[in-house]
Amino acid sequence: YKWNETKKEVILLNKEDDEKVQIKRIVTFFKTIGVENIGPGLYKKMYLAGFDTIYKIINIKKEDLLKLDGIKEKSSQKIFSSLHNIIDKEIEIEKIITGTCILDSIGYKILKKITEKYPKLFEEDIEINLEQLIEIPSIQEKTANKILGKLSEIREFLKIHNQFKFKTIKLENVNDVLNIVITGKRDKSIKEFIDA
């Protein structure tokens, strides 16, 4: 490990080689895109059985699940359904990118601002520079540099995982953009309705 620039946090070196980090990234990815009813323990079982990448898990078959320790027919069906209820539908590209952890501390809201201005930036080989990203509200130079540095890695991930269908929102004009404020408890169904 090493200290970060501010000397306040420790950064793990060789993240790609650390089993715990890889399992946590897999769990984070599927949780971020909305897969339910599958916990960290099950993802760990998949990982240890050789389904150690997002690609392998999204392509897992019911028969493969039955080979996992403690998984019977009913459980394999439930797991398979939980995965495919999400991955077979359109998913917001921002959720996919956030879930990959490629951009570490850059989340959904920042990515959403970018895709509103440049909808195909992450899918296609579109040229973009630092100044164009900084023009977007809330994006500072450090964030823009991080995005530019990881852009090819994100595009490569999306090419490899081409079975994902991206949800796109097309606005007719700028007046269609609404600012919605929710007070009190944030109900998941209300948030999904607003996002849809």
Predicted regions and their residues:
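Long, low-complexity intrinsically disordered regulatory regions enriched in P/S/T/G and acidic residues
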Residues: 1-11, 63, 74, 149-150
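Compact, charge-rich alpha-helical regulatory domains located at protein termini
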Residues: 32-41, 48-72
